[in-house]
């Protein structure tokens, strides 16, 4: 069984929920405190043992490449001014993994974005991490899925429970059997209509996929939103070769929409020793 050393991070979306801020800045570069959201995703992959990451980008995404590249002029200035802590942070972001880029030329959905990286992945299993979800956990969420893959040899999809009222916003699994936090899956349903979801176990932006998925994506017809949906291709693959789901442990932060982004920023700030006390005082002063 091949070890998983490669990851795909899709980052080609237009970020329309954050306009006009994302007109000139990639959504993935919006910061949670002092780090862009995409760095949290790359850090999770690196902690899970991933060595090579391909980021699928689109137009106006050059800032992502610049962020993970070295900037010698800035490093020199920080060094001359004795700002060693900032220098270390800047250098750290360039040393997380080997990062490559491919452009998704058309906005045709998540499945199409994954297909764009086929040449990079080759005939190896790989992980996918979506940038809308930051997960805080002792064992990285995607590493939990890798562990299941290493036991089963099959693709594994990360899930967590959501309120039934929200199931229409997610891909949902119809579980067949359960073993602890691990499920065999009868069916995958992409964004079921309100009240029709087979469970409240939602796909949460973390995947381990075998390379066979590319064959299914190649022939996948357009689905929800007239896009090539990854969930639809996984469902077809599951009909031929069992796909597992795993209810990963960890606190998930939804940074793909404005309210979730604000909540995440506040929660991370409250965890920061340098601002917790003053921020707590400020919140109390608001008298909410």
UniProtKB/Swiss-Prot annotation:
Give the transmembrane region(s).
Answer: none
Which InterPro entries does this chain map to? Answer: GalU_uridylyltTrfase_bac/arc, NTP_transferase_dom, Nucleotide-diphossugar_trans
Reaction catalysed? alpha-D-glucose 1-phosphate + UTP + H(+) = UDP-alpha-D-glucose + diphosphate
Taxonomic superkingdom = Bacteria
- Pfam families (alphabetical): NTP_transferase
Q: Which UniProt keywords apply?
A: Carbohydrate metabolism, Nucleotidyltransferase, Transferase
Q: In which pathway does it act?
A: Glycolipid metabolism; diglucosyl-diacylglycerol biosynthesis
Gene Ontology MF terms: UTP:glucose-1-phosphate uridylyltransferase activity
The EC code for this enzyme is: 2.7.7.9
Its GO biological process annotations read: enterobacterial common antigen biosynthetic process; UDP-alpha-D-glucose metabolic process
Q: Does the keyword Transferase apply?
A: yes
Stated role: Catalyzes the formation of UDP-glucose from glucose-1-phosphate and UTP. This is an intermediate step in the biosynthesis of diglucosyl-diacylglycerol (Glc2-DAG), i.e. the predominant glycolipid found in the S.aureus membrane, which is also used as a membrane anchor for lipoteichoic acid (LTA).
Q: Which family does it belong to?
A: Belongs to the UDPGP type 2 family.
Q: Per its record, how is this protein called by name?
A: UTP--glucose-1-phosphate uridylyltransferase
| Record organism | Staphylococcus aureus (strain bovine RF122 / ET3-1)
